[in-house]
């Protein structure tokens, strides 16, 4: 453990992001207290905040890199040892009454994301915290108030079995508070009383419902475990991600009106799945189970949040979903939250917050500058992944089947494989297999798109010139013109529609 920093850090939220923040602070010698609204998250009876039992998440480079900075190799090995490597998408469909599937690799170099158990990840982080002497965990504590000028906060000590009497309240002091308490953050609510926060909340026109594909009778996976399975529809989609117990956790994403249609009768649900998600029912989920799961599991909205700034003075900062809830279509919500912690503590380190020779007043000023730097750096990147995640919903439910998507993916992967010095990569690779800032990812992808467009136009002009020369010099072979005209027109139409 590092020498005591004489900082007291209070973290609200003991989920993965809050737990990682506690490990970072503890490693720097801070006195850390973690307060969690729910009971001990390692207790199976603890109810998730979204009231579902969903256990799957996509853990990729950003999240793994952030955890590696804790230098707790055993913890990381424990987490990844239970994860399932996912190398790409498996697109499902049906033509002429025949089922088909097509694999789309994420990366030409064979890299993969990890389908990880959310509970297993959170438990591993909490176990590490419990073994860290300068960390205290407080479950069943609800944040009820905060004074970020006086650096005080108040929590109710809740007793799960007692819902009648008023919970006793405790007052605590801190040097700074980290709000990691999710999209409906109480920390953010209280911080907004002090900081002039621009806040934007959006519910997209989509609901989600969880389904479950069980293992076979022999205890094996029913479909490939190393893919994210997608049944795309133009306005909706059904996906499946593998779990360690050989089952799949599935999600139906669709508009409110589509859910209303499915709710109208049992026949509507079965007919819709047979038409739009071929091979799911009855092959993977029985009709009875499909109906039961649809009626039993909640139909939940998807929330997207942007706000700024992420801090107040030297005493408060929000991270993860509390700062930037994103829709789940890039699998980056948790990864972005974990990356927040790496960026936050890099800013604290760079501004000399942990200089033990500095006075408390000087360190407070340094911390204020560090939190401002964190806001400046992270806001643009969080807004970028927010936008990318929304756009990826369109790609997953529709774009993966378009010729343009396949053409651009093929071109970019070819350049990445055979001319790596150009630094050419697909958007997915930049997001999932690097730590390139999200805002820079958007700029790089736009630049690549522009170059590909100009390259295509040049190819069209060159082809037209060649055809013209041939037609002039070899009139008897003018049929070559009509032979090339159609594909040239198609290529131009695809690029024009894509960029308009």
UniProtKB/Swiss-Prot annotation:
This is Kynurenine 3-monooxygenase acdD. It comes from Aspergillus candidus. The chain crosses the membrane at residues 451-471. GO terms for cellular component: mitochondrial outer membrane. Pathway: Secondary metabolite biosynthesis; Cofactor biosynthesis; NAD(+) biosynthesis; quinolinate from L-kynurenine: step 1/3. Keywords: FAD, Flavoprotein, Glycoprotein, Membrane, Mitochondrion, Mitochondrion outer membrane, Monooxygenase, NADP, Oxidoreductase, Pyridine nucleotide biosynthesis, Transmembrane, Transmembrane helix. Its main location: mitochondrion. The gene is acdD. It is an enzyme of class 1 (oxidoreductase).
């Amino acid at each position: 453990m590092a020498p005591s920093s004489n900082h007291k850090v209070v973290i609200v939220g003991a989920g993965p992001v809050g737990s990682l923040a506690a490990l970072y602070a503890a490693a720097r010698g801070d006195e850390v207290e973690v307060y969690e609204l729910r009971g001990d998250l390692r207790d199976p009876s603890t109810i998730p905040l979204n009231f579902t039992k969903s256990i799957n998440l996509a853990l990729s480079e950003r999240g793994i890199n952030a955890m590696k900075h804790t230098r707790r190799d055993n913890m990381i090995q424990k987490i990844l040892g239970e994860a399932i490597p996912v190398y790409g998408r498996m697109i499902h469909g049906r033509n002429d009454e025949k089922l088909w599937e097509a694999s789309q690799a994420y990366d030409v170099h064979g890299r993969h994301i990890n389908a990880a158990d959310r509970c297993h990840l959170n438990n591993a982080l909490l176990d590490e915290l419990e073994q860290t002497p300068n960390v205290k965990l407080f479950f069943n504590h609800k944040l009820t108030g905060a004074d970020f000028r006086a650096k005080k906060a108040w929590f109710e000590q809740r007793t799960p079995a007692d819902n009648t009497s008023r919970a006793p309240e405790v007052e605590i002091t801190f040097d700074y508070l980290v709000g990691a308490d999710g999209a409906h953050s109480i920390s953010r609510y209280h911080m907004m009383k002090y900081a002039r926060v621009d806040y934007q909340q959006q519910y997209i026109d989509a609901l989600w419902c969880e389904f479950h594909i069980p293992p076979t009778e022999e205890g094996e996976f029913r479909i490939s475990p190393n893919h994210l399975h997608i049944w795309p529809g133009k306005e909706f989609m059904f996906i499946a991600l593998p779990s360690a117990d050989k089952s799949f956790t599935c999600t139906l994403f669709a508009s409110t009106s589509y859910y209303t249609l499915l709710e109208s009768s049992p026949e509507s649900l079965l007919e819709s799945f047979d038409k739009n998600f071929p091979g799911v029912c009855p092959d993977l989920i029985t009709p009875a189970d499909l109906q039961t799961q649809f009626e039993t599991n909640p139909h939940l909205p998807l929330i997207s949040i942007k706000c700024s700034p992420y801090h107040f003075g030297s005493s408060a900062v929000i991270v993860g979903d509390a700062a930037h809830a994103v829709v789940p279509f890039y699998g980056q919500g948790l990864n972005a939250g974990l990356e927040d912690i790496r960026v936050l503590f890099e800013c604290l380190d760079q501004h000399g917050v942990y200089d033990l020779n500095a006075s408390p007043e000087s360190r407070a000023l340094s911390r204020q500058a560090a939190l401002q730097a964190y806001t400046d750096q992270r806001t643009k990147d969080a807004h970028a992944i927010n936008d990318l995640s929304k756009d990826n919903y369109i790609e997953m439910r529709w774009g993966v089947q378009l010729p343009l998507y396949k053409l651009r993916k093929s071109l970019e992967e070819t350049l990445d494989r055979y001319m790596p010095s150009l630094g050419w990569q697909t958007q997915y690779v930049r997001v999932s297999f690097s730590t390139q800032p999200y805002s820079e990812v958007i700029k790089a992808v736009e630049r690549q798109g522009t170059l590909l467009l100009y390259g295509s136009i040049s190819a069209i002009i060159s082809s037209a010139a060649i055809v013209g020369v041939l037609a002039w010099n070899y009139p008897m072979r003018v049929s070559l013109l009509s032979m090339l005209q159609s594909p040239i027109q198609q290529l131009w139409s695809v690029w024009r529609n894509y960029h308009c």
